[in-house]
Amino acid sequence: MDTRIYEVAGQLVIKGKGILAADESTPSCNKRFLAVGVEQTEEMRRQWRELLLTMPGIAEFLSGVILYDETIRQQTDQGIPFAKLLEEKSIIPGVKVDEGTGDFEGHPGEKITKGLEGLASRLKEYRAMGAKFTKWRAVIAIGENIPTQDLIEKNAEILAEYAEVSQDEGFVPIVEPEVLLEGNHTIEKAEEVTTNTLRAVFAALHEKRVDLKGLILKSSMVLSGKDCLQQADAKQVAAATVRTFQNSVPQEVAGIVFLSGGQSPQQATENLNEIVKLVRQPADWPLTFSFSRALQEPVLQIWRGDSAKIKAAQQAFLKRLKLNAAALSGTYAKDME
């Protein structure tokens, strides 16, 4: 295995910076565009990603950016490939390599992630395009009689196989088992499912002999279900999240990054701030953010496909990055919004 992956993993979770998730699939991106009246075309998606990636000063707050297959093939107006643009800013380009979810046979309401077939050859192509790390997402829904242990173990196995192939090809794998926010479950239920899921993932990684020092975990925060009547506050979220990690994540892991998973931008930042404050310093693992919607939503609301609004939209992006950087040092406050 290429030992340079340790260096890349360390740079991705460097203190004070986060990772932008700009890897929404075409259908996901189109859905967001539709909501704000932006034309759903490849060119508009390219313009949107260009707005984010060309923002002046971005490198102060971002260590890496996760791209999508379409995006890593795109260029700026000046003809610079996005991956090269990031490299020039000393930001590490990565790529999401899973191919979405499909039904898990015999398990209604549960999904497994596709994309292992042909993965090694896709990775060779991405490496030639400049990518240095990969990401793969599994989804775990909480509902009546779900998740099943079968589903958790199957997704853990698939994540481990993906991680093994990634490291063999010289990439740092980001493994993302997302426990979904949808549902009316309590925070206690979310903690139980997240702990169980992470233990299964690390057992599968151990079995595949994946090197945890060259791997990053992308995790959900432990939250009450969206429709739960009793919503946990940020301090409760932090306590449940940190406890979950202490009970399930080996210390060798290079770092943990958080997904925002449908939280509002403010909620995600506030919860991150409380988690950082609670974690023992020096922490067992470096912690940072890897948000998508929680960074992009306010920016998209301003831009709405209008090139005259690019500067104002970039200012909103810069503001969210600054607020999350404050959260990484535990100094965020609501009145900074």
Where are the predicted features?
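Catalytic core of soluble alpha/beta enzymes
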Residues: 181-252
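Hydrophobic residues within beta-strands of alpha/beta enzymes
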Residues: 65, 134, 173-174, 215, ...
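Short glycine-rich or small-residue beta-strand-to-loop segments that form or flank ligand, phosphate
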Residues: 180, 256-259
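Helix-rich catalytic cores of soluble enzyme domains
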Residues: 119-204
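Short, histidine-centered active-site or binding-site loop motifs used for metal coordination
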Residues: 99, 140, 179, 221-223
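Conserved, mostly hydrophobic/aromatic
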Residues: 41, 136, 175, 217, ...
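A structural motif corresponding to the C-terminal end of an alpha-helix
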Residues: 61, 125-131, 165-171, 204-212, ...
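Alpha/beta catalytic barrel-like cores
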Residues: 1-129, 142, 230, 234, ...
